Amino acid sequence: MNEFTLNAEQRSDLGKGASRRLRRLASLVPAVVYGGDKAPESISMLAKEVAKLLENDAAYSHIIELNVGGKKQNVIIKALQRHPAKGHVMHADFVRVIAGQKLTAIVPIHFLNEEAPVKKGGEISHTTTELEVTCLPKDLPEFIEVDLGSLEVGDNVHLSELKAPKGVEFVALAHGTDLAIANVHAPRIVKDEEEGEAEEGAAE
């Protein structure tokens, strides 16, 4: 049984006004399912079920079993529209997953051994926190690991240095873009401290 499941119902009342009514009156999240050889479907889901599903970060990059009126299909999250202030999901886009057919998905990065460069006096900047990948459904990773343990102050990590899991391709590299993933830099001196030292020097 799929660890990630979501129930939904088809909706025929479309448009921005209808979507607002769904959210306000029925606590529902409007969504669209597309891809494969089927026509796009407009659906709605209980907001509380969507929120519960997304409590697990793995859901963002995992195949979800979507039950629409009793008919099950496998999908992945393509995009989420959130409320700018409250953060809850206002609309969702799902893409159907077809066995044997490659898919494109966004996968989070998990950084390992971050304490090592920090102990050497460095500060870590995460330039990229998720990656777009292409693979077959069976090869879809929940995350990509990046080990920072060997980095020194001044070092950085680029996408080309990462080893993609078997069967997985990084979309950016395929398009000739070598993304910066993370870097280790010397701690920035707080401006107030610099001013304080300057004042002390002037007083002397």
From Swiss-Prot:
One of its GO terms (biological process) is translation. The keyword Nucleotidyltransferase does not apply. Pfam families: Ribosomal_L25p, Ribosomal_TL5_C. Keywords: Ribonucleoprotein, Ribosomal protein, RNA-binding, rRNA-binding. Gene3D superfamilies: Ribosomal protein L25, beta domain, Ribosomal Protein L25, Chain P. GO terms for molecular function: 5S rRNA binding; structural constituent of ribosome. CDD domains: Ribosomal_L25_TL5_CTC (cd00495). The keyword Glycoprotein does not apply. NCBIfam families: bL25_bact_ctc, PRK05618.1-2, PRK05618.1-5, PRK05943.1. This is one of the proteins that binds to the 5S RNA in the ribosome where it forms part of the central protuberance. Part of the 50S ribosomal subunit; part of the 5S rRNA/L5/L18/L25 subcomplex. Contacts the 5S rRNA. Binds to the 5S rRNA independently of L5 and L18. Belongs to the bacterial ribosomal protein bL25 family. CTC subfamily. This is Large ribosomal subunit protein bL25. It comes from Pseudomonas syringae pv. syringae (strain B728a).
